[in-house]
């Protein structure tokens, strides 16, 4: 259920603020979003996989807390990230 190395590197490069940035909230949220989307497709085939569902809920909550942190620190970066990832309507 993890991302492939190439796709993870592409996500990091696309959302990084600097050259060696892998830990900024933008990168972390983008990686979590990709993993969440992967798990959503997994649950379409495996509806009774409750163990993985717990992991999904933990990832969603982690993403939520990172987004609220980013919103408090810099609202423009938050809005740009939301639009870029298509998280809100």
From Swiss-Prot:
It comes from Janthinobacterium sp. (strain Marseille) (Minibacterium massiliensis). GO terms for cellular component: cytosolic small ribosomal subunit. It comes from the Bacteria. Keywords: Ribonucleoprotein, Ribosomal protein, RNA-binding, rRNA-binding. Gene3D superfamilies: 6.10.250.3130, S15/NS1, RNA-binding (1.10.287.10). One of the primary rRNA binding proteins, it binds directly to 16S rRNA where it helps nucleate assembly of the platform of the 30S subunit by binding and bridging several RNA helices of the 16S rRNA. GO terms for biological process: translation. SMART domains: Ribosomal_S15. Part of the 30S ribosomal subunit. Forms a bridge to the 50S subunit in the 70S ribosome, contacting the 23S rRNA. Coiled coil: none annotated. PROSITE patterns: RIBOSOMAL_S15. Belongs to the universal ribosomal protein uS15 family. This is Small ribosomal subunit protein uS15. Pfam families: Ribosomal_S15 (PF00312). One of its GO terms (molecular function) is rRNA binding. InterPro entries: Ribosomal_uS15, Ribosomal_uS15_bac-type, uS15_NS1_RNA-bd_sf.
């Amino acid at each position: 259920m993890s991302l492939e190395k190439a796709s993870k590197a592409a996500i990091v490069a696309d959302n990084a603020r600097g050259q060696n940035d892998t830990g900024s909230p933008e990168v972390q949220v983008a990686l979590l979003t990709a993993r969440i989307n992967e798990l959503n497709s997994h649950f379409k085939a495996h509806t009774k996989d409750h163990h993985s569902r717990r992991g999904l809920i933990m990832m969603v909550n982690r993403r939520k807390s990172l987004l609220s942190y980013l919103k408090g620190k810099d609202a423009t970066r938050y809005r740009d990230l939301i639009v870029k990832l298509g998280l809100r309507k």
